[in-house]
Structures are given as structure tokens and as C-alpha cells.
UniProtKB/Swiss-Prot annotation:
Pfam family, one: Leu_Phe_trans
MF terms in GO: leucyl-tRNA--protein transferase activity
Catalytic activity of the protein: N-terminal L-lysyl-[protein] + L-leucyl-tRNA(Leu) = N-terminal L-leucyl-L-lysyl-[protein] + tRNA(Leu) + H(+); N-terminal L-arginyl-[protein] + L-leucyl-tRNA(Leu) = N-terminal L-leucyl-L-arginyl-[protein] + tRNA(Leu) + H(+); L-phenylalanyl-tRNA(Phe) + an N-terminal L-alpha-aminoacyl-[protein] = an N-terminal L-phenylalanyl-L-alpha-aminoacyl-[protein] + tRNA(Phe)
EC category: transferase
EC number of the protein: 2.3.2.6
Keywords associated with the record: Acyltransferase, Cytoplasm, Transferase
Protein name listed in UniProt: Leucyl/phenylalanyl-tRNA--protein transferase
Record InterPro entries: Acyl_CoA_acyltransferase, Leu/Phe-tRNA_Trfase, Leu/Phe-tRNA_Trfase_C
Native source organism of the sequence: Jannaschia sp. (strain CCS1)
Location within or outside the cell: Cytoplasm
GO biological-process terms attached to the record: protein catabolic process
Gene Ontology cellular-component annotations: cytoplasm
Sequence similarity: Belongs to the L/F-transferase family.
Length: 212
């Protein structure tokens, strides 16, 4: 996928810089957990989830109806970061982790977590700004864990008045769930609109049931 990258030499990434970048349609990544450098990405085509078009498969529908899990919001945000970074390759380095933790402390970064009897089964996390949610990463430790987290996340975003769910890039997996690409100009128009609107990520209790 074509995208523009802007290397950032040290000094350090800051939470304020990250927020200003998100508002401009740019997001940071690194080359790996042990690589201290951060680069800025501005894709020519941007991945988004339609908040009314998330595809719930029969298997996922059965999982939701069967239950056997609980949903928590921000219960273990640091653990979610660790879970997302615990893969090869990873784009989350120490500076990014520190900034996400700081944004979480400011109420701007959130995790939707799926828990079962064995612990954290899967999760997704991202950053909120106005009525935009910037999805950063997700992981599963049990079958369907991240899909369950996504389903509950989208329900929460819709209830909270969000208008944009930015996935940054799209993969075949995300496309199978309904994600698609927007040209940069269209994405920026949607982002500009979303930034002017109020939204509330915490408008729902964390254990609200998902009816499918």
C-alpha cells in the first residue's frame, strides 16, 4: 500500500505531539520493540470501519449469544498494550507505549477487553479525539477474542456518538469484517467533521449486553 512516511529523529515523542498528529491525519509507528526511532505515516488510502456495517459472522454471533466471557473497559490497559506488542514483528516500541499510557491517564486512550476464566482473552485499544476513534491494535489469546472485542467496541462507539472509526490500514481480516479504504482527501474530510463533534466513549456501562 502506498503511503508517505516522515522519519522523526530523536528527541522524544510526546502525547501532545501524537494528538496533534492524529488531528492532522497522521499516525506514528516504529520498526520494532527494540528500535527507538519513530516514523510518521500518512497513507494515500486510509482504512475505516463503517459503524453501521460491521459484519458479524455466524460463528461470532454464536459466541456472543453463548457468552462465557465478560467485557471490561480499561481494566488492564497496560496489559493490553503488552498483548498487542507481544508479536513479531511489532510496531510498538517503548516511547509509543509510554505515550499511550499517558494518553490513557488523560482519558484519551481506551481498551475494550474480553475476559474469561483464564484471564484476558483478547482486546482492542485506541485513541479518541472528538467523535473519532483511532484503532491502534488488537490481539487474541483465545479463538475469537479480538472479534468479540471489536463487536463490543463498535456498539460502544455507536452509542457514544462517534462518527469515524479509523483502522489506519486494512487487512484481509479487517475487510472480512466490513472495513474498507478511503482516499486520503475523503478521509481527511470525515476526520475534520468528526473532530468538531462531541462523543463519549464511557456512555455505556462496561457490562452492557450485546444483542445480535
Amino acid at each position: 500500500m502506498a503511503h508517505d512516511m516522515y522519519p522523526q529523529p530523536r528527541p522524544l515523542l510526546t502525547p501532545d505531539l501524537m494528538i496533534r498528529a492524529y488531528a492532522a491525519g497522521i499516525f506514528p509507528m516504529s520498526e520494532g520493540a527494540d528500535n527507538p526511532e519513530v516514523f510518521w505515516v500518512d497513507p494515500q488510502r486510509r482504512g475505516v470501519f463503517p459503524l453501521n456495517g460491521f459484519h458479524i459472522s455466524r460463528t461470532l454471533r454464536r459466541q456472543i449469544r453463548f457468552g462465557g466471557y465478560s467485557v471490561h473497559i480499561n481494566r488492564d490497559f497496560a496489559g493490553v498494550l503488552d498483548g498487542c506488542a507481544d508479536r513479531e514483528p511489532t510496531w510498538i516500541n517503548a516511547d509509543l507505549t509510554a505515550c499511550y499510557l499517558a494518553l490513557h491517564a488523560q482519558g484519551l486512550a481506551h481498551s475494550v477487553e474480553i475476559w474469561d476464566d483464564e484471564g484476558l482473552a483478547g482486546a482492542v485499544f485506541g485513541v479518541t479525539l472528538g467523535a473519532a476513534f483511532f484503532g491502534e491494535s488488537m490481539f487474541s489469546r483465545r479463538t475469537g477474542g479480538s472479534k468479540l472485542a471489536l463487536a463490543h467496541l463498535i456498539h460502544r462507539l455507536r452509542a457514544g456518538g462517534f462518527t469515524l472509526f479509523d483502522t489506519q490500514f486494512v487487512t484481509d481480516h479487517l475487510m472480512s469484517l466490513g472495513a474498507f479504504e478511503l482516499p486520503r482527501s475523503d478521509y481527511r474530510a470525515e476526520l475534520s467533521h468528526a473532530l468538531q463533534l462531541p462523543a463519549d466513549f464511557m456512555s455505556l456501562p462496561e457490562d452492557v449486553p450485546l444483542v445480535v
